[in-house]
Amino acid sequence: EVKIPSCVKEIGSYAFSGCFWLHSIDFDENSQMKKISELSFVGCLSLEKISIPENVDEIEEGWCHSKITNFSISEKNKNFLFHQEKILLGKSDKNIEKFDSLLFAKRSIEHVIIPSFVNKICALSFYLCTNLKSVEFEEKSELKIIGKSSFNRSTLKSIIIPSSVVCIEDKAFLMCNKLQFVEFEPNSKLKII
């Protein structure tokens, strides 16, 4: 277990890289944490618990490569939303009101419906979701980008890609050994795979 002191404002890239036996991250009360950088917890495959403090206003793509099952966010944090207790949503720009980026999915999920207002599934969002069977998108999806390795090593079986998607980044479906069905909606705007 690691308890981050209240004076720490940022967790840098690779800060806990390879900490295989790390099980939980806690933050002191009155935490001043503002940013969790990309790849902060890469290789922390035993990490199961983290609670995001209220002052965090930036979580970078690919911040977490773990099997977190106990995830929470301070009710006072207005920058992120744990939607349906399954997916972490954030804002791509602090000046906008809507949560338009999907940053993380609870590793135990089997099925998820992604809200229409999400325009990017960020890198590694569904990485190691070993119970995932299907992903659906609400009607009139605004999704534009499926990020790098976003479904890497998941057990996704089927997906219908919304017509709004213009880019599927590198390794988005790498090692999806159970993937049997991929369909693109009519009038697809896809330009890059």
Regions found by a protein language model. Give the residues of each.
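Consensus positions within tandem repeat domains that build extended binding/scaffold surfaces
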Residues: G12-S17, S37-S40, G62, S101-L103, ...
